[in-house]
Amino acid sequence: MTPMRKTNPLMKLINHSFIDLPTPSNISAWWNFGSLLGACLILQITTGLFLAMHYSPDASTAFSSIAHITRDVNYGWIIRYLHANGASMFFICLFLHIGRGLYYGSFLYSETWNIGIILLLATMATAFMGYVLPWGQMSFWGATVITNLLSAIPYIGTDLVQWIWGGYSVDSPTLTRFFTFHFILPFIIAALATLHLLFLHETGSNNPLGITSHSDKITFHPYYTIKDALGLLLFLLSLMTLTLFSPDLLGDPDNYTLANPLNTPPHIKPEWYFLFAYTILRSVPNKLGGVLALLLSILILAMIPILHMSKQQSMMFRPLSQSLYWLLAADLLILTWIGGQPVSYPFTIIGQVASVLYFTTILILMPTISLIENKMLKWA
């Protein structure tokens, strides 16, 4: 008798995606992050839903409603900190997932890659709006500074900023609309993630060797469900350790002070996962130039498939490209570090050098090294 999972229309869909899915037999732990991102999204939607039940999206009550959640709501403190640190874990998994895609050439699956870029942008927008909701000092000034960047757009910039604010400054209307979008975007992200999976299953997963694996595939269950379960266990262990021992490690102390439009914090900075882009933004002296550099720092990912010059998909057997890849990873860490430092010497010059190196590595060095490696293949 045929199992129900192969006959029932709904079960068949789940079966083809998670149970009998043909999967390359040699994919490593770097392929775990897709399922971990799904787990992160479920965690964020669940904790966010419970927080939304007690949150008040109004400038006069938002800060006190967060205090109420933390102090008075049953287990409110852990729900709040799981949500805040869950966002950090989300971005760690996201960056590692993108890093794996770059290293093993997964960007050649263009539909999957492009939906992934849209997912990244949607996640960044959601996280930014979520950071505004506690209505602390860094929430208020972060929202003011980042939304004000749109004023760099010629002719319509100022009107656009005031339209987003719902007035002449960041206030209650801004907070209400940010809360609305912060609530709805995760569901749009979930829909996009389904599309991401749909297109991935059209081509099948990539593998570390970067060669076709049609002749050597195994079922996703039980082999990779067990592997993903181990990854999930380690992820939950890390998240719970962070949440229970150092819940404010990745936050900003200024956000425990009520938003005050008359008092500017000494160093306005976004959450740690945006610091690399923030450094690139402030490394350009011109406002419009900085905004364009900021956009390009993310959208450059869409150019990666065009810049791929190598005859091999993966970097597995390309030591020169590997060296450049790790140089880029180190450069991103430097950019993240500089983003958290004050705008003064020597940090400004380090930030500018790191920003130039970021774009040079991706746009010039990587394609050039790939062409050199192609020549070396002929000599071998």
Curated annotation (Swiss-Prot):
InterPro entries assigned: Cyt_b/b6_C, Cyt_b/b6_C_sf, Cyt_b/b6_N, Cytb/b6-like_sf, Cytochrome_b, Cytochrome_b_C_euk/bac, Cytochrome_b_N_euk/bac, Di-haem_cyt_TM
Effect ascribed to mutating residue 339 to E: In mitochondrial myopathy
Keyword Ribonucleoprotein: no
Documented effect of changing residue 35 to P: In exercice intolerance; with cardiomyopathy and septo-optic dysplasia
Disulfide bonds: none
GO cellular component: a single term: mitochondrial inner membrane
Membrane-protein topology: Multi-pass membrane protein
Binding locations of a ubiquinone: 201
Entry keyword set: Cardiomyopathy, Cataract, Deafness, Disease variant, Electron transport, Heme, Iron, Leber hereditary optic neuropathy, Membrane, Metal-binding, Mitochondrion, Mitochondrion inner membrane, Primary mitochondrial disease, Respiratory chain, Transmembrane, Transmembrane helix, Transport, Ubiquinone
Cofactors, names only: heme b
GO terms classed as biological process: animal organ regeneration; cellular respiration; electron transport coupled proton transport; mitochondrial electron transport, ubiquinol to cytochrome c; response to cadmium ion; response to calcium ion; response to cobalamin; response to copper ion
Membrane-spanning intervals of the chain: 33-53, 77-98, 113-133, 178-198, 226-246, 288-308, 320-340, 347-367
Chain residues that bind heme b b566: 97, 196
Residue positions binding heme b b562: 83, 182
UniProt signal peptide: none
Primary location class: mitochondrion
Alphabetized GO MF terms: metal ion binding; protein-containing complex binding; ubiquinol-cytochrome-c reductase activity
Family assignment from sequence similarity: Belongs to the cytochrome b family.
Function: Component of the ubiquinol-cytochrome c reductase complex (complex III or cytochrome b-c1 complex) that is part of the mitochondrial respiratory chain. The b-c1 complex mediates electron transfer from ubiquinol to cytochrome c. Contributes to the generation of a proton gradient across the mitochondrial membrane that is then used for ATP synthesis.
Protein name (database record): Cytochrome b
Gene that this sequence comes from: MT-CYB
